[in-house]
Amino acid sequence: AAIFFAGTPILESAMVYPLAICGACILTSIAGTFFVKLGTNNSIMGALYKGLIATGVFSVAGLAVATYATVGWGTIGTVAGMEITGTNLFFCGLVGLVVTALIVVITEYYTGTNKRPVNSIAQASVTGHGTNVIQGLAVSLESTALPAIVIVGGIIGTYQLGGLFGTGIAVTAMLGLAGMIVALDAFGPVTDNAGGIAEMAGLDPDVRKRPTRWM
């Protein structure tokens, strides 16, 4: 999107800005790992969420530093009649971080074993395979609505703030949290594999249930 600033004095800054955001977010992701600690309930997912929250907070600060150091807070140019300011681009980055947080919350709601969607599928399974498939399909279709609305809202909001370049900055900020997000995504398959190995090895039933309790 920086090509919109071709031939202007801020072209280099516009190209460096997304790279600066990524660099800052790499550092914030590393810093966030130091906050991954078990609480009194021994919930590993809770510990991972602590790291994600810390990373998000640090990323806001990193985004502010990257914005100030590369493009500043004032007007940096005009694209298609739209005035682009560093402040607006900073808010675009914040929108990207908020969208990421909302998607994590929505995902937790639709996949958590103690939440309504999963419990409704389990309840439907009592009456047979058919109702299980029907309810599972219904929940899966329902679960795509909120993420789509959040993403569309983020696109519209960032475009109003900073045009296509602003949308690109929001996406860059989202990708900056990829380190902690991948850690969250990877934990599920690891615990599933641990439980499967325990079951195939004929270990005590409590050993099989333990990975599930970690979630």
UniProtKB/Swiss-Prot annotation:
EC number(s) for this protein? 7.1.3.1
Record's Pfam families? H_PPase
Q: Which UniProt keywords apply?
A: Cell inner membrane, Cell membrane, Hydrogen ion transport, Ion transport, Magnesium, Membrane, Translocase, Transmembrane, Transmembrane helix, Transport
- What are its cofactors? Mg(2+)
State its location(s): Cell inner membrane
As its record notes, the protein acts as a catalyst of: diphosphate + H2O + H(+)(in) = 2 phosphate + 2 H(+)(out)
Give one GO molecular function term. Answer: inorganic diphosphate phosphatase activity
Query: Single GO cellular component annotation?
Result: plasma membrane
Instruction: State the InterPro entries in the record.
Output: PPase-energised_H-pump
Write down the superkingdom of origin.
Bacteria
**What's the protein's topology in the membrane?**
Multi-pass membrane protein
Where does the chain cross the membrane? Answer: 16-36, 51-71, 86-106, 136-156, 164-184
Question: Subunit structure, briefly?
Answer: Homodimer.
State what protein this is by name. Answer: Pyrophosphate-energized proton pump 2
User: Which source organism does the UniProt entry give?
Assistant: Rhizobium leguminosarum bv. trifolii
The organism's taxonomic lineage, starting at the top: Bacteria, Pseudomonadati, Pseudomonadota, Alphaproteobacteria, Hyphomicrobiales
Q: What's the encoding gene here?
A: hppA2
